Amino acid sequence: MGLKGYSVGEGGGEIVEVQGGHIIRATGRKDRHSKVFTSKGPRDRRVRLSAHTAIQFYDVQDRLGYDRPSKAVDWLIKKAKTAIDKLELGETTTTTTRQEPVNTKPESPTLVFQRENNDQTQFVAANLDPEDAMKTFFPATTTTNGGGGTNINFQNYPHQDDNNMVSRTTTPPPNLSQDLGLSLHPFQGNNNTVVVPETNNFTTTHFDTFGRISGWNHHDLTMTSSSSSEHQQQEQEERSNGGFMVNHHPHHHHHQPSMMTLLNSQQQQVFLGGQQQQQQRGTLQSSLFPHSFRSWDHHQTTSDHHHHQNQASSMFASSSQYGSHGMMMMQGLSFPNTTRLLHGEEATQPNSSSSPPNSHL
C-alpha cells in the first residue's frame, strides 16, 4: 500500500490509497475533517451512529477489550466476512439476467365460444378458411356415438313459429320486394264504380312460382294451354258473357298464354250477383304488371245465377288454399270454357255496350 501526496485546497493534504478506496488525509487540520473516497464519492471518515447502535457498539468494544473503536469495527467486519461475501455474491447474481427460451412454434388458431346471460360472444381467428369461418357463426356441440357417426346439435338460437315462416325459393327483383297485388283504378273521366269492393286486398305471395305451373286439375275441370287461334276465339266468347281477364300483349300470345285471376267465395257473390248490375267501362290499370285489363258489361239474371252457382263455386273452392283473400294467379295457363261455367252457355241477353279497345300500360 503506497502513499502519494497531493496538495488539496489551500491547507494542503494528501490522498492515502488504502484497500477498497482512497483516504484524503488533511494536513494542518484536525483529523475529524478527513474524507475518504468511495465508489459513490468522498465521504466523512467519521460515522455518526444512532444512540441505540452506539450503545451496542461500545458494549462489543468493551467485551473485546479494545481501546479504539476502529479495532472493534475491524473485528466485526472480519467476523461478518462470510456474510459480506454472500452479499457480494448476491449482488452479482441479482445483476445477472436470465433469458427465457423463446417459443418460435406458431400457434394454431383457436376458437372461443362464450355465452353468459343470453349475451353471446364469439372470437374468430383471422386466418381461417371461408368454410371454417362460416362454421364459427353456429355454435355446435359435436358428439361421437358408438357407430362412429357424428351428431351436431345446434343450440342457443331462438325458434320462430312455423306458421310465420315463409319459404323463399327465389330471390325477388328489387322492385318486387313489397307484397304483390293488382291496383284497380278506373280510367280518367269514368265515374262508374268498380265491381270489386275496396275492402278486399288482392295480395299474393310467391308470384315467381306461378310461372312454373304447367297444369291445374280440379274435380272435373281440366285446364290446358291452348294455341293463339283458340285464345282469340275464347276472348270473343268471353266478351259476350262478361268477366275480367288479364292478358299479355297480343304479340306475346304465342309465347305466354293468358293469366286469370280467381276470386274467393265472398267476391263471387259480388262478381256473380244478378241483383247488382253494375257496369265498368274503361281501362283497369296495374302498377305492377305490364298487362292490359279488359272490362265489359256484366248482365246476368237471377235464375242463371242460381243455376250455375254450384258449378262456379266448385272452381273457386280451391282459391282458399292460396291465402286468406282467396286469390290465385296462374301464369302460362288458359282456361277454356271458363266463362261458360261462370255465366252459363244459355245466356241470351245481348250486351248493352261493346267492349272498349285494349290499352297497354
Swiss-Prot record:
GO molecular function: DNA binding; DNA-binding transcription factor activity
Main location: nucleus
Cited InterPro entries: TF_TCP_subgr, Transcription_factor_TCP
Keywords tagged on the record: Developmental protein, DNA-binding, Nucleus, Transcription, Transcription regulation
Biased composition (Basic and acidic residues): 295-304
One cellular component term from this protein's GO annotations in UniProt: nucleus
Pfam family, one: TCP
Tissues expressing this chain: Mostly detected in lateral organs, such as leaves and flowers. Expressed in cotyledons, particularly in the vascular region, in leaves, roots, stems, buds, flowers and immature siliques.
Subcellular location: Nucleus
Residue ranges of the region described as Disordered: 220-259, 295-317
All copies of domain TCP, residue ranges: 29-87
GO biological process, one term: regulation of DNA-templated transcription
Keyword Transit peptide: no
Superkingdom of the organism of origin: Eukaryota
Quaternary state and interactors: Interacts with AHP1, AHP2 and AHP3. Interacts with SPL.
Purpose: Plays a pivotal role in the control of morphogenesis of shoot organs by negatively regulating the expression of boundary-specific genes such as CUC genes, probably through the induction of miRNA (e.g. miR164). Participates in ovule development.
Protein name (Swiss-Prot/TrEMBL): Transcription factor TCP10
Organism: Arabidopsis thaliana (Mouse-ear cress)
Name of the coding gene: TCP10
